[in-house]
Amino acid sequence: RSRGLGDVYKRQDLTQRAIHVQKTIIRKLADRESCVIIGRSADYILKEQKPILRIFIYSPEDVRIQNVMKSHNFSAEDAKMFITEKDKRYHKRHLALTGSNRGDRHNRDMLIDSSLLGVDGTAELIEEVAKKVFHE
């Protein structure tokens, strides 16, 4: 079945509604209590919120490929394709919402390469930084 312009508009409208709902939920959570929000362009949505700690966590491509191979039982080639497609979707969504590139250091307080300390070590580092930033 071919898709007409009506289908395109419906999908765009649905995407915009989903983004609006996400923004509303994220703002309500942040207004209600201290919270950690992973992804969803929350750094942009909460840019006026104070205090805030905006962190971008990344790892080198080879580490990401190994993680996906292990977690999804993919070949290296399939893992790389999976990561590429996922990144494209995330970047496209973030750019449409914010006008900036995902991972842009100018919109972050910290960038952390999680391959240096691993998942637990990265979480511990963030916890320590948050305690200092929020004086806890």
Task: Tell me the role of every PLM-derived stretch.
Residues 1-9:
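Single conserved hydrophobic/aromatic residue that forms the stacking wall/gate
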Residues 5, 49-52, 107-108:
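Short glycine-/polar-rich loops that comprise or flank the Walker A/P-loop
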Residues 10-47:
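Glycine-rich phosphate-binding loop used to anchor ATP phosphates in small-molecule kinases
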Residues 40, 44, 61-62, 74, ...:
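Long, contiguous binding/interaction regions
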